[in-house]
């Protein structure tokens, strides 16, 4: 019975990791280098996902990324963030995520090495 629970939990966790990887590939690669997904992509001035893991508070930064600049101008979290102000110029397509999506991205980031291979 314990093994079955472990397998189910592990399966859910792996599903979150895979969903987080897909979300990161779709949205985060616009600006960041995200592991092996786009090793030569991203914007030069933005930190890579692996580089961020070197910071002592990396987990908090990923869990709360949507409140840290410049993300509030780009990302809206359903049922958390305010709607985009119509007066604000839309220089990029808004990214709309849920808190479950944020958790999935964090689950994926936890699988990345703290240093580039």
Can you annotate each of these PLM segments?
Residues 68-84:
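Short glycine/proline-rich, acidic loop/turn segments that cap or connect secondary-structure elements
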Residues 21, 35-68:
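Gly/Gly-Pro-rich "capping" loops immediately C-terminal to redox-active cysteine motifs
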Residues 80-117:
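C-terminal capping alpha-helices of c-type cytochrome domains
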Residues 16, 23-24, 58-62, 101-105:
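Stable alpha-helical elements in mature extracytoplasmic
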Residues 20, 24-35, 105-108:
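The canonical Cys-X-X-Cys-His
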Residues 25, 29, 54, 67, ...:
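Sec-exported extracytoplasmic/periplasmic mature domains
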Residues 7-23:
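Electrostatic cytochrome c docking/interface patches
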């Amino acid at each position: 019975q314990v093994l079955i629970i472990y397998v189910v939990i592990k399966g859910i966790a792996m599903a979150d990791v895979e969903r987080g990887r897909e979300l990161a590939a779709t949205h985060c690669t616009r600006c960041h280098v995200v592991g092996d997904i786009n090793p030569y992509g991203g914007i030069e001035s933005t930190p890579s996902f692996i580089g961020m893991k070197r910071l002592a508070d990396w987990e908090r930064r990923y869990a709360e990324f949507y409140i840290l600049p410049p993300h509030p101008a780009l990302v809206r979290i359903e049922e958390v963030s305010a709607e985009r102000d119509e007066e604000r110029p839309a220089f990029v397509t808004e990214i709309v995520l849920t808190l479950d999506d944020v958790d999935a991205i964090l689950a994926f980031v936890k699988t990345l090495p703290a240093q580039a291979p």
